[in-house]
Amino acid sequence: MIDQKIFETTLNIDDPANFCTNVEAHLLKELENIYVGKCFKNSFILNITGVIQRSPCFIMRTNNSGRGYMHVRFSALVSCLNAFDLIAAVKIIKNDSNIILGESLLTEPVTIVIPSSESQNNVAEVGQIVPVQLANSSVYYIPGRQQASATGSIFIPKHTFSVYHVQEELTQEQALNLTKLVNIIEMLLESRSKKDFKQICFFEKLYYTYSINSDEILDLKIWKGPKGKEMARLKPCNVLSFLYDALKNKSSSLGFWARPPDLFKSSPLAYQQDQNSFNTTELPIICSAEVMFVTLLKEIINYLQFMNDLCDTFNNEQLIKRHENIWMLIEQKKI
């Protein structure tokens, strides 16, 4: 995910006299030279956006070098990969009995290790582009490196889901804090609306948990879901509309929330019910309304970006056909 972050650091200054002739210009240049295009504090820095605070230039008195140093707080545009993130385009650069390596074509530079011990991963050939889900706690940002490293597997639709039990109402202030994530979703939806609808249908159907036919899709624009798959007696809730109502104190977040497999994962939909009747063996996760909505919104963002990236990457029929072995693998894993 692209984000803004604030960092603190101490810069060593080789020529304090020259540096202080134009501190702002020299400081920005120094920050760019050291950090842009490199890993730093669990992020990959794309651009320095500003200096927030700086100390005077201090002279080192422990030696006779004449060098100086300065404490700096700065903001930067960064890319951050997290556990379980989806990457739509990972190009396989090595595949042998010991290891499978891939490089992301869409995110910041990252090398992804794909375990060859998992048989599903061995279908990918060198040069092919595969969709990957990162493993848990698998992203490593080593300071100063020009790329991150991670572990992941070819992404297969998931059958499991979590149920969240919310026992306190979402406040207006909390709903306001969620508008940043809502805005990202709306931006991704706008981008999606400009893509080829046939491509969207292909990948939505491919990554739907159940096996379905094209004519079973009712309306992917609002993600009602395939015929016969809707949960009985339940009507899905549009999370975005719900949060806009929450800003006006016109909605209640109490109860049990979930996004089970009958919903398209890139949809802004979820189910809410008073009593837990979701078909899962896992116990409900008790959490605040804010934590639950952050979790749901980030999942929606992840899947929406994933679907948009798939459409952008596999943008012609020939490229899609060259990867039929990957699509067949995904279809075989469905319920």
UniProtKB/Swiss-Prot annotation:
One GO BP annotation of this record: viral transcription
One GO CC annotation: virion component
Principal subcellular localisation of the protein: host cell
Entry keywords, A to Z: DNA-directed RNA polymerase, Early protein, Host cytoplasm, Transcription, Viral transcription, Virion
Induction description: Expressed in the early phase of the viral replicative cycle.
Subcellular localization, as worded in the UniProt entry: Host cytoplasm; Virion
Comment, domains: Contains an extended C-terminus, with no homology to characterized proteins.
Stated role: Component of the DNA-directed RNA polymerase (RNAP) that catalyzes the transcription in the cytoplasm of viral DNA into RNA using the four ribonucleoside triphosphates as substrates.
Complex formation: Part of the viral DNA-directed RNA polymerase that consists of 8 polII-like subunits (RPB1, RPB2, RPB3, RPB5, RPB6, RPB7, RPB9, RPB10), a capping enzyme and a termination factor.
Similarity comment text for this entry: Belongs to the Asfivirus DNA-directed RNA polymerase RPB7 homolog family.
Name of the protein in question: DNA-directed RNA polymerase RPB7 homolog
